From Swiss-Prot:
Localization annotation: Cytoplasm
BP GO annotations: purine ribonucleoside salvage; xanthine metabolic process; XMP salvage
Reactions catalysed according to its record: XMP + diphosphate = xanthine + 5-phospho-alpha-D-ribose 1-diphosphate
Record note on quaternary structure: Homodimer.
UniProt keyword terms in alphabetical order: Cytoplasm, Glycosyltransferase, Purine salvage, Transferase
Record organism: Lactobacillus acidophilus (strain ATCC 700396 / NCK56 / N2 / NCFM)
Official protein name in the record: Xanthine phosphoribosyltransferase
GN (gene name): xpt
Binding positions for 5-phospho-alpha-D-ribose 1-diphosphate per the UniProt entry: 128-132
Amino acid sequence: MKLLEERIKRDGEVLDGNVLKINSFLNHQVDPKLMMEVGKEFKRLFAGEQIDKVLTCEASGIAPGVMTAYQLGVPMVFARKKKPSTLNDAVYWADVFSYTKKVNSKICVEEKFLHEGENILIIDDFVAHGEAVKGMVNIAKQAHCNIVGVGAVVAKTFQGGSDWVKDEGLRFESLASIASFKDGQVHFEGEE
């Protein structure tokens, strides 16, 4: 998605450890117009698929997830990183490792929001090593849902998460696929 790639090049900051900081439009402050375009693009990419629900993970997955769900006309559910006191005990759990925070944690979705046989589209803000996606796939499988595919706003394809998704036999679509970081610059797949 050219618009997204241009925004990453303009406003993104490459940090040590192959981390891309895009806090000005996705991971802290959100650009709703850009996220609406993200939702439209995921709708276009997954056209023809029967999708009943979008599954994402809090917090940065919510903006692209809700815009995608809005475009598709379906509900969105997000996996929580902590179980609030208002959640009952009927919960699907999965372990995830945060690449940027360097901590293991659990994510959860209340069972009443995922139903056997539902067609689920997983949307994530970043897919690097794919830990959050692995957790969401695990939760969708616990609920006996059909996973239509995984959509990443940004994929760092050199870190293996997108390969894991494909190795699981799942469709993977990324709106901005990063091949490498060199000299503090982002290099997208297909660039010279």
